[in-house]
A protein has these predicted regions:
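Active-site-adjacent beta->alpha loops and helix N-cap segments on the catalytic face
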Residues: 28-31, 54-62, 84-91, 104-131
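Hydrophobic faces of well-ordered beta-strands that scaffold small-molecule active sites
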Residues: 18-23, 44-48, 76-82, 100-102, ...
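Long, hydrophobic/aromatic-enriched structural stretches that serve as scaffold segments
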Residues: 80-85, 95
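Glycine-rich, positively charged N-terminal anion/phosphate-binding segment
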Residues: 5-6, 27-72
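N-terminal amphipathic alpha-helix/helix-capping segment at the start of soluble metabolic enzymes
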Residues: 1-20
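Structural recognition of alpha->loop->beta junctions
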Residues: 72-75, 95-97
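Glycine-enriched alpha-helix->loop->beta-strand junction motifs that scaffold or abut catalytic
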Residues: 40-42, 94-100
């Protein structure tokens, strides 16, 4: 089942457990992680990011991640990790991510804060959590 990352992170904090987060590079990793999460009956965050784009076309892989999350017996979040631009995280959202991470750490501090505000102003009203 596709899950809201904010809800599960709060629930974990309030109940003394962590929600595991795995960067996924290919279908075999994705299936192994989802099988393990279901066996453990644990919510899970599966992510894909800019570092992995050369390995797989995101639009195609995002569909597989989203489909597996939606059909999972446990809560699963699809997170785009370390997006280097607004356009990258927006594209990930359009193709199935239900959480995004905008990495503006290479910008000067004030620009980083401004960019983070721009991203959160766009995504939060759409119910999409932002890690920054």
């Amino acid at each position: 089942m596709l899950a809201d990352m904010r809800w599960w992170l709060r629930h974990g904090r309030d109940n003394g457990y962590a929600v595991p987060h795995f960067n996924v590079w290919n279908a075999e990793m994705l299936m192994g992680i989802m099988d393990a999460a279901e066996e453990a009956r644990s919510p899970v965050i599966i992510s894909f990011g800019t570092s992995f784009v050369s390995n797989v076309v995101y639009e195609e892989f995002a569909h597989l991640m989203r489909t597996m999350a939606e059909h999972s017996a446990v809560p699963a979040v699809v997170l785009w990790d370390h997006g280097r631009s607004f356009e990258i995280v927006h594209n990930a959202y359009r193709h199935g991510a239900n959480a995004v991470m905008r990495d503006a750490s290479r910008l000067p501090f004030e620009d980083n804060v401004s960019e983070t505000r721009r991203v959160t102003d766009y995504f939060h009203p759409r119910g999409i959590p932002v890690e920054a």
